[in-house]
Amino acid sequence: MDIKGQFWNDDDSEGDNESEEFLYGVQGSCAADLYRHPQLDADIEAVKEIYSENSVSIREYGTIDDVDIDLHINISFLDEEVSTAWKVLRTEPIVLRLRFSLSQYLDGPEPSIEVFQPSNKEGFGLGLQLKKILGMFTSQQWKHLSNDFLKTQQEKRHSWFKASGTIKKFRAGLSIFSPIPKSPSFPIIQDSMLKGKLGVPELRVGRLMNRSISCTMKNPKVEVFGYPPSPQAGLLCPQHVGLPPPARTSPLVSGHCKNIPTLEYGFLVQIMKYAEQRIPTLNEYCVVCDEQHVFQNGSMLKPAVCTRELCVFSFYTLGVMSGAAEEVATGAEVVDLLVAMCRAALESPRKSIIFEPYPSVVDPTDPKTLAFNPKKKNYERLQKALDSVMSIREMTQGSYLEIKKQMDKLDPLAHPLLQWIISSNRSHIVKLPLSRLKFMHTSHQFLLLSSPPAKEARFRTAKKLYGSTFAFHGSHIENWHSILRNGLVNASYTKLQLHGAAYGKGIYLSPISSISFGYSGMGKGQHRMPSKDELVQRYNRMNTIPQTRSIQSRFLQSRNLNCIALCEVITSKDLQKHGNIWVCPVSDHVCTRFFFVYEDGQVGDANINTQDPKIQKEIMRVIGTQVYTN
């Protein structure tokens, strides 16, 4: 007979009698003979006390000595744009399902682990990454973990904090020399915590005060970018667990996120705390080896694989790579833009400098070798494969499998290269609908977010202190292949610098569109910046000559492209203003928000000034309607 597992929770007061005999806490003819280890019960109760009744659910299997423990991780602390970029539902918990031996618990076999979101059926790549992380964590813990060991650890912990125990003697010894410092690094144990029984709120505070250093998330109701339109958006605000909270928003310290939480409240609470520590910083670690990424400008928004060859092979064979078919179906215009940027960088005379990262693509005919290898760059072969990537317009008009077959016939490396272009993008890009910034005069407008949670948190802290404004950043399209993967970096006095740095080192911005349009057109041998009058004439000419192509064209139809970004910048004393040329030496104080693309020498209105109240109002309108819905 096939016995199906039954879920149990405190609300299950009714139901048919046949299923009740399998439920946790109910004695039945089959379940009566099964022994449930008391440490398992204690750990389950600890989860309920520290989190909530709904944070854990249990499923027993009748006569089988197995039990599934579902731990519900609340991820509402993630910002809206982060959860969207990571393809997770921030309104729904991530479920960690661990299968233990019912009678042996920690003395039994190592538990199997599943990670899922019930409503997130496809493309849950974050779940695969988290499953791998928690699997490694459990394997390490299981080497020394047992029911007796856990009980001993808890007894030691409790005796340490008894009024007659070690902590009292330790404090007395300290008082001979000096008073206990009132420092965040040494939380003070109040006498009230050492005497009598605490109330529930105080007890929970006491628990948190006694933890090892680790990361956890709170969920204050704060808007995504500090703008008022959305009451649902949450602020990522990591803190050291058990220590007095630091400034209003402290930056994430990713090194702490691999610290092992205490076993004081059992293994289930420990693994939940570890998952909470790791989730906000998944983008900072390789999805395969779990080693921290090393980037010139820090981590980026989306999780990715590192450049180690073993990781690249595993990434390919595990199928974690973003499916090109899905991306073309859901964001064809974005894929079109990514391919255009890759082509511009590859065809640049400066490709040896700016075409970074170079693709790491596994050979489909020999999965043990790399067809494209950063250590052995072959730009000609790469160009041939890129030329064989069919237009995204064609891909949307027929069967994707048939189009893939056609590409494979043209060049077997074309489709793997397309997959790499999509999966290596570490920024969140969304094509804006009709409610876009009309004064930019282009249909190719994108929401562009590249800052990881830690940088966005630091940005918000600085914004509360100093305020912010908007300014344009102009850079030739050949540079954006790298910017989307490495971030907007301070290129002054480096090999990446294309223009002069007359006003010092930093990221160059301008409130005036004509200045940024000038920078965006420079590249591919063009090193003279057009004057504002020339840009105005070009803009007027492009908008009076009858257009052969519709302004509402969905896809890019030209390889002659100009682009500029609209950034939000902190208005602190670090921002150096030299007339209409601004220099920000602090990369954490600049975050990209929007991206605009123009074809065939087209430019937008050269007279736009982001400090104009009407322009600012329009920017705020689009942010309010786009950031929160995308």
UniProtKB/Swiss-Prot annotation:
Keywords: ADP-ribosylation, Glycosyltransferase, NAD, Nucleotidyltransferase, Transferase. It catalyses: L-aspartyl-[protein] + NAD(+) = 4-O-(ADP-D-ribosyl)-L-aspartyl-[protein] + nicotinamide; L-cysteinyl-[protein] + NAD(+) = S-(ADP-D-ribosyl)-L-cysteinyl-[protein] + nicotinamide + H(+). Residues 394-620 form the PARP catalytic domain. One of its GO terms (molecular function) is protein serine/threonine kinase activator activity. Its EC number is 2.4.2.-. The keyword tRNA processing does not apply. SUPFAM superfamilies: ADP-ribosylation. One of its GO terms (cellular component) is nuclear envelope. It holds the Pfam family PARP. Signal peptide: none annotated. Auto-mono-ADP-ribosylated. It is an enzyme of class 2 (transferase). It comes from the Eukaryota. One of its GO terms (biological process) is endoplasmic reticulum unfolded protein response. The modification ADP-ribosylcysteine is found at C237. InterPro entries: ARTD_PARP, Poly(ADP-ribose)pol_cat_dom. The modification ADP-ribosyl aspartic acid is found at D600. Mono-ADP-ribosyltransferase that mediates mono-ADP-ribosylation of target proteins. Belongs to the ARTD/PARP family. This is Protein mono-ADP-ribosyltransferase PARP6. It comes from Homo sapiens. The gene is PARP6.
